[in-house]
Amino acid sequence: MIPNRDTIEQKQLGWVELITGCMFAGKTEEFIKRLRRHAFAKRNVIAFKPVIDTRYAVNEVASHAGTLLPSIPVNSTAELKEKLEAKILEKKVDVVGIDEIQFFDEAIVDYIEELADRGIIVIVTGLDKDFRSQPFKNVDRILPLAEMVDKLTAICQKCGNFANRTQRIIDGKPADWNSPLILVDGNDSYEARCRNCYQIEKG
C-alpha cells in the first residue's frame, strides 16, 4: 500500500548529521553554528556534552576559537536519555546536539538512531580517528547511518599543509602507541598534523 501524500507531509522527518575530522578542524564551531541557525528558525534546540570534556567550560560547548553554546553535561547515554526525555515531556524538542560522541558509551549510537526515527534532527560531532589514527568508537558506527556527513580538515601545526590527523604530544615528544586512549586536554597535549608530519612511537 502506498501512503497518501497528506500522511507523508504530516510526518515530521528526522535525520542525523555528523561533523567529524581531526582536532582543531572547527567541528565544534560548525556544530554551534548549525544549532544556532535552528534556534533562529524558532526550533526548540537542546545540546549535550560529555562530562569528561571540561577544557574551556563546564556547562557550555566551547570551540577552540572561544565560541560558546549552553549545554547539559552528562556522564553516560542513560543520563542523557533521562534528561532529554524529561525535556521532551515538558515541550517539543526539534533538534538535539551531541558534542564529542567518541567519549560516550556505545549505547549512544542506537539512541541517536531512535531519536531520528522519532522525527528529531540530531547533530553530532566526533573525532574520526584517535591519536593512533585508528577509527574512533561510535563515530565509525554513526558514519554509515548519518544522512549528512561533513569531514573537516585543519592546518598542520608543523608545516602548514592541510591536516587530517591528531598528534598527541607528551613532554614535547610524540606519544607512544601504548599511552592511554582517552586524555582530554587543551592545545598543549595535541596538534593537528598532516600525513607527512604525523608521528607515532610504537614501543
Curated annotation (Swiss-Prot):
It holds the Pfam family TK. One of its GO terms (cellular component) is cytosol. Zn(2+) binds at C156, C159, C194, C197. Gene3D superfamilies: 3.30.60.20, P-loop containing nucleotide triphosphate hydrolases. The active site is at E100. It comes from the Bacteria. InterPro entries: P-loop_NTPase, Thymidine_kinase, Thymidine_kinase_CS. GO terms for molecular function: ATP binding; thymidine kinase activity; zinc ion binding. It catalyses: thymidine + ATP = dTMP + ADP + H(+). It is found in: Cytoplasm. It is an enzyme of class 2 (transferase). Keywords: ATP-binding, Cytoplasm, DNA synthesis, Kinase, Metal-binding, Nucleotide-binding, Transferase, Zinc. One of its GO terms (biological process) is thymidine metabolic process. Its EC number is 2.7.1.21. ATP binds at G21, C22, M23, F24, A25, G26, K27, T28, D99, E100, I101, Q102. PANTHER family: THYMIDINE KINASE (PTHR11441), THYMIDINE KINASE, CYTOSOLIC (PTHR11441:SF0). Belongs to the thymidine kinase family. Homotetramer. This is Thymidine kinase. It comes from Mesoplasma florum (strain ATCC 33453 / NBRC 100688 / NCTC 11704 / L1). The gene is tdk.
